[in-house]
Every structure is written in C-alpha cells, then in structure tokens.
Swiss-Prot record:
Name of the protein described by the UniProt record: Hemoglobin subunit alpha
Residues annotated for O2 binding in this entry: 59
Phylogenetic lineage: Eukaryota, Metazoa, Chordata, Craniata, Vertebrata
Domain of life: Eukaryota
Family in the record: Belongs to the globin family.
Tissue specificity as recorded in UniProt: Red blood cells.
Function according to Swiss-Prot or TrEMBL: Involved in oxygen transport from the lung to the various peripheral tissues.
GO molecular function, a single term: iron ion binding
PTM annotation (N6-acetyllysine): residues: 17
Modified-residue entries (Phosphothreonine), positions: 109, 135, 138
InterPro entries: Globin (IPR000971), Globin-like_sf (IPR009050), Globin/Proto (IPR012292), Hemoglobin_a-typ (IPR002338), Hemoglobin_oxygen_transport (IPR050056), Hemoglobin_pi (IPR002339)
Gene coding for it: HBA
GO biological process, any: hydrogen peroxide catabolic process
Organism field: Panthera leo (Lion)
PROSITE patterns: GLOBIN (PS01033)
Length: 142
C-alpha cells in the first residue's frame, strides 16, 4: 500500500504528539491484543500477561521503538525494518495475521488517548501505515 505525502504527514504529526507515551501505548495495545485475540498469547508463554506486567510493558516499548523507527524512515520501511522482519519470519515465526490484530489494537489505543486528533483522515493514514509496516514484517515469509 502506497502512503501519500498527506498520509506520511499525518503519521508523523500523530506520532509526534504521542511522544514519551509511545511505550505506554504500545503496552496498552499489546494488552488489548491479548484480551481481544487470545491466540496471540501463544507467542508469549514465558510472559506474565497480567495487566501492567513488567514484561508486557517492556515488549510494548519494543513495539513502540520499532514503530518510531518506521516513522523516522517512513520512505524506506523495508530497509529500516529488515532485521525485525528476519526475526519475526525466521526465528519467532509469528503468524502474519497477528500483525493485523496488533495494528487494530494500536488504532483503538491511539483513538482512546487522542480523540480530538484522531480524525477520519488521520485514522486512514495510520491504518495504511500500520498495514505497510505489517507488509514489510511479513515480506520474508514468502
């Protein structure tokens, strides 16, 4: 999916407003994913998946850091996320549908925390961005 210049601007502006809350939102989105899509828990058998768990918080920060890197390198997602794509495809073997689940939960989390900024245009841009990130992360599965 091609991101237009307006999409890129929307994503950068929204992510800029998230700022220091990115890790917190990443963890919240993970918790939402685990609750809404219980099969996603199978990839984390060694985690304490309870609300506020330090392990979920730490992984939420990793998710946020990866997305921040993607925002910074929005014009070159394949190169920016190549190592992460390798990890998920070859080592972790995460079912690609789980990226869609997490993307949905990220959208819900951002909408809850930033309702005024979460316009239909921003929603569409973020959805396209998360879809592009998911596509890159699953590109090495083939």
């Amino acid at each position: 999916m091609v991101l237009s210049s307006a999409d890129k601007n929307n994503v950068k502006a929204c992510w800029g407003k998230i700022g220091s809350h990115a890790g917190e939102y990443g963890a919240e989105a993970l918790e939402r994913t685990f609750c809404s899509f219980p099969t996603t828990k199978t990839y984390f058998p060694h985690f304490d998946l309870s609300h506020g768990s330090a392990q979920v918080q730490a992984h939420g920060q990793k998710v946020a850091d990866a997305l921040t890197k993607a925002v910074v390198h929005i014009n070159d997602l394949p190169n920016a996320l190549s190592d992460l794509s390798d990890l998920h495809a070859y080592k972790l073997r995460v079912d690609p549908v789980n990226f869609k689940f997490l993307s949905h939960c990220l959208l819900v989390t951002l909408a809850c925390h930033h309702p005024e900024e979460f316009t239909p245009a921003v929603h569409a841009s973020l959805d396209k961005f998360f879809s592009a990130v998911s596509t890159v992360l699953t590109s090495k599965y083939r």
